[in-house]
Amino acid sequence: QARESGAMVMNLPYNMGIGSAVQSGFLFAKEKGYHFAVQVDGDGQHPTSEIPRLLSALDNGVDLAIGSRFVQPTEYRPTLTRSLGIKIFTFLVCLIVGKKIYDTTSGFRAASRKAILLLTEKYPHDYPEVEALITRHRNEMHFVEIPVELNSRQAGRSSIGAKNAVYYMLKVTLAVFIAIIKRRQR
């Protein structure tokens, strides 16, 4: 459907995970000399009509614009498990970056050229959104949240199902604690 709409579509040889897929997109953007890159999930939930608002933030000197589900009240209601995970990650990331972030797990993001260059080198491979925020913070990049209202899921299912929810929580929490330890060692 994306190709039919005129989008360039990258076919990877096999399922390498979300982090590798996103990093491949950043590598493509770097090689083509793009000034901005926009990340959207493939399930149709992210309103592409909001992309200009994210890009506008980048035009104003921000390195990352996050399409946020929580910065303002919306109709979006995550499951109880997902809501708990988001709250835990948000609390931990806020400890590290020193400012309130409402949606640390949003996959709807726009990145500046500076962020593209960083993320081609340093991008987590499993469930990368939270870790990528910390990486950007460590590299003194500025980010902002733009309120968005999600569409209902049009296709597919979440990559974080019942089977791997515990793995996801442990892996990301461990990565955040490592980031906290590294920060204190500086």
Task: Say what each PLM segment does.
Residues 171-186:
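C-terminal, non-catalytic tails of nucleotide-sugar-dependent glycosyltransferases
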Residues 99-100, 121-124, 134-151:
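Catalytic donor-sugar/metal-binding loop of nucleotide-sugar-dependent glycosyltransferases
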Residues 1-5:
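Acidic helix N-cap motif at the loop->helix transition within catalytic regions
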Residues 8, 12-31, 36, 48-126, ...:
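Acceptor/aglycone-binding surface of glycosyltransferases and processive sugar-polymer synthases
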Residues 42:
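Cys/His-dense Zn2+-coordinating finger/ribbon modules
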Residues 45:
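Glycine/small-residue-rich loop that forms an oxyanion/phosphate-binding "nest" at active or ligand-binding sites
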Residues 131:
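Cell-envelope/extracellular polymer assembly enzymes that use nucleotide-activated donors
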